[in-house]
């Protein structure tokens, strides 16, 4: 069973619908025992970094997610959920993240002719391969965000060009992140969720 972590900061209905389209048995949960028992986890997210971390803390989920990852559970963060994977974020001051991938979440710099938030379809540029990146180079996906993940190159898999390279996908071990919304990115996005399902299956041999 795949668990979509529920903490009132994510577009969970669309994520669950997309997972169902690729044959994933998934449900929404904030129950620590269900999260720790899951085969794989998805952390969606929309909104502000500090508010989202507060919602996770209020539910006692920060240490639960960290423990699940330490136990080897695959985790996919989507949009704000990807940003929360980092050590810290600079939205409305400096705030601690989940600390699962080294890096800092920063605001996209203002650039002439490029409004913030970065909103709409953008092409992907492969930097290095991961379990989720096959066939993605040059594909177009849907972004909505004002902040980006500043991570060391070793964790950067895919970028998009928005006046500068913007991290689109990152990963460390069994922790993956998509800055864009795979659930809103048509067949390309569904393909990423399908690859995550396959990765979870290979990781657990029982999904």
Curated annotation (Swiss-Prot):
Cysteine pairs bridged by disulfides in the record: none
UniProt GO molecular function: glutaminase activity; imidazoleglycerol-phosphate synthase activity; lyase activity
Domain Glutamine amidotransferase type-1, first and last residues per copy: 1-206
Pfam families, sorted: GATase (PF00117)
Keyword Lyase among UniProt keywords: yes
Catalyzed chemical reaction(s): 5-[(5-phospho-1-deoxy-D-ribulos-1-ylimino)methylamino]-1-(5-phospho-beta-D-ribosyl)imidazole-4-carboxamide + L-glutamine = D-erythro-1-(imidazol-4-yl)glycerol 3-phosphate + 5-amino-1-(5-phospho-beta-D-ribosyl)imidazole-4-carboxamide + L-glutamate + H(+); L-glutamine + H2O = L-glutamate + NH4(+)
Name of this chain's protein: Imidazole glycerol phosphate synthase subunit HisH
Biological process according to GO: L-histidine biosynthetic process
Localization annotation: Cytoplasm
Keyword set, alphabetical order: Amino-acid biosynthesis, Cytoplasm, Glutamine amidotransferase, Histidine biosynthesis, Hydrolase, Lyase
Signal peptide region: none
Biological pathway: Amino-acid biosynthesis; L-histidine biosynthesis; L-histidine from 5-phospho-alpha-D-ribose 1-diphosphate: step 5/9
Species annotation: Streptococcus gordonii (strain Challis / ATCC 35105 / BCRC 15272 / CH1 / DL1 / V288)
Annotated Gene Ontology cellular component terms: cytoplasm
Binding partners and assembly: Heterodimer of HisH and HisF.
Origin superkingdom: Bacteria
NCBIfam families: IMP_synth_hisH (TIGR01855)
Lyase listed as a keyword: yes
Functional note: IGPS catalyzes the conversion of PRFAR and glutamine to IGP, AICAR and glutamate. The HisH subunit catalyzes the hydrolysis of glutamine to glutamate and ammonia as part of the synthesis of IGP and AICAR. The resulting ammonia molecule is channeled to the active site of HisF.
């Amino acid at each position: 069973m795949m668990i979509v972590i529920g903490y009132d900061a994510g577009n969970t209905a669309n994520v669950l619908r997309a997972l169902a389209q690729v044959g994933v048995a998934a449900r929404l949960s904030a129950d620590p025992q269900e999260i720790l028992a899951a085969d794989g986890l998805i952390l969606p997210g929309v909104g502000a970094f500090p508010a989202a971390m507060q919602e996770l803390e209020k539910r006692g989920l920060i240490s639960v997610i960290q423990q699940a990852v330490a136990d080897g559970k695959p985790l996919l963060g989507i949009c704000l959920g990807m940003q929360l994977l980092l050590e810290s974020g600079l939205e409305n001051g400096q705030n601690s993240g989940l600390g699962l991938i080294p890096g800092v979440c920063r605001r996209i710099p203002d650039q002439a002719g490029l409004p913030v938030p970065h909103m709409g379809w953008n092409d992907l540029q492969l930097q290095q391969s991961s379990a989720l990146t096959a066939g993605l180079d040059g594909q177009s996906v849907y972004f909505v965000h004002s902040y980006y993940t500043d991570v060391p190159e070793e964790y950067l898999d895919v970028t998009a060009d928005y006046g500068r390279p913007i991290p689109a996908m990152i990963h460390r071990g069994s922790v993956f992140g998509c800055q864009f919304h795979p659930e809103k990115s048509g067949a390309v996005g569904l393909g990423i969720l399908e690859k995550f399902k396959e990765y979870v299956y290979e990781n657990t041999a029982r999904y």
